[in-house]
Structure formats: C-alpha cells, structure tokens
C-alpha cells in the first residue's frame, strides 16, 4: 500500500473529521484524481519534440500519457485541426498516491526560489491546480537526457465541498502553502 494512502486512512481522516466538525466519516474530503498536463505547442513544427515530451511525462507519471489534439485551426499559432499539441495523464488509486508522495517530498522542495504554494489556486470547489516551470524538479528526469526545459500543469481533484475543506485536506498531506 502507498505510504500516503495508509497515512490518509489511519491519521488524516480522523483529524479532518474532528477539525471540520463532520458527522459521518464518508463526508471527509479525499483526493479523487491527479491530472498532469503538458502543453507542447512546438510539436506542430517538429514531431520529435512531442516524443521527448511523452517520454518525460511517462517517466514522471509512471503511466503512458494520452496525446491531446487541437480542436480547431488557429492561423496565429500556426496549427491546424487535429494536430498534436500536448499530452495528459490522469492518475488514480495507488499511482496517484505514489505520485503525490514524490511531488510533496521530492519535486516541490527542488523548485528553484520556492517560497510556498499559493493558496489562491483553488477553484471554489476544493480542487487545486499548480504549474511547474521545469520538469527537471522530478528525480525521474535526467538533466543530461532532456532536449529542452518544459513545464507542466498539475490538477488535484478532491471530494471537498469548498476551498476551506480542500485546503485542510492538502495541508494534512503536507503541502507547503504560503502563510
């Protein structure tokens, strides 16, 4: 069992139930899924760039990503309908908790000039999104083998009813928010 899943079931649930004054244990917020998204606009010019991005995302997530295609042609961006422009991965279950563990303990502390996560990135329903400017923060990515530095978006979807519950859940997991 993943370390954070065990920690959630044994400690976080009881702590949040009393902290949020919830009656039922099923009301305690939980993380449903984590979505990783990497936009690769340069892939329209060179197909190799997309391959490198897919390899990076596969190494980070431990799961094969899905290539996202453009929905319509945009002349200003020089892309056509149906061209590959990004990749995404949705993590659930054990892999989600393993990724969350690596994100909190290894990747976030390795971010340059890090002063804490913004508490304003909640969407109003308890879900949290953050962007990373460099994929090299993850230990799976070898700096010598990458072609360029790419960022990625991380969306954490929770069962929380509002931002306060979502913030309490992520703080219980050890997310370093700005105070």
Swiss-Prot record:
GO terms for molecular function: rRNA binding; structural constituent of ribosome; tRNA binding. One of its GO terms (cellular component) is ribosome. It comes from the Bacteria. One of its GO terms (biological process) is translation. Keywords: Ribonucleoprotein, Ribosomal protein, RNA-binding, rRNA-binding, tRNA-binding. It holds the Pfam family Ribosomal_L5_C. InterPro entries: Ribosomal_uL5 (IPR002132), Ribosomal_uL5_bac-type (IPR020930), Ribosomal_uL5_C (IPR031309), Ribosomal_uL5_CS (IPR020929), Ribosomal_uL5_dom_sf (IPR022803), Ribosomal_uL5_N (IPR031310). The keyword Transport does not apply. Signal peptide: none annotated. SUPFAM superfamilies: RL5-like. Belongs to the universal ribosomal protein uL5 family. Part of the 50S ribosomal subunit; part of the 5S rRNA/L5/L18/L25 subcomplex. Contacts the 5S rRNA and the P site tRNA. Forms a bridge to the 30S subunit in the 70S ribosome. This is one of the proteins that bind and probably mediate the attachment of the 5S RNA into the large ribosomal subunit, where it forms part of the central protuberance. In the 70S ribosome it contacts protein S13 of the 30S subunit (bridge B1b), connecting the 2 subunits; this bridge is implicated in subunit movement. Contacts the P site tRNA; the 5S rRNA and some of its associated proteins might help stabilize positioning of ribosome-bound tRNAs. This is Large ribosomal subunit protein uL5. It comes from Francisella philomiragia subsp. philomiragia (strain ATCC 25017 / CCUG 19701 / FSC 153 / O#319-036).
């Amino acid at each position: 069992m993943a370390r954070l899943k065990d920690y959630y079931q044994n400690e976080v649930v009881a702590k949040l139930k009393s902290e949020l004054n919830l009656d039922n244990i099923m009301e305690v917020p939980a993380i449903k899924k984590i979505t990783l998204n990497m936009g690769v606009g340069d892939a329209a010019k060179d197909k190799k760039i997309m391959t490198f991005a897919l390899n990076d995302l596969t190494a980070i997530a431990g799961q094969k990503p899905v290539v996202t295609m453009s929905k319509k042609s945009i002349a200003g961006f020089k892309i056509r309908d149906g061209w590959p422009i990004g990749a995404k991965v949705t993590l659930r279950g054990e892999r989600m908790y393993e990724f969350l563990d690596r994100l909190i303990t290894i990747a976030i502390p390795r971010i340059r000039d890090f002063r804490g996560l913004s508490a304003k990135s909640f969407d109003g329903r308890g879900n949290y999104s953050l962007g990373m400017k460099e994929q090299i923060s993850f230990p799976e990515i070898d700096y010598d083998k990458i072609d360029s530095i790419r960022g990625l978006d991380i969306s954490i979807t929770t069962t929380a009813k509002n931002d306060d519950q979502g913030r309490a859940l992520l703080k219980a997991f050890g997310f370093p928010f700005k105070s």
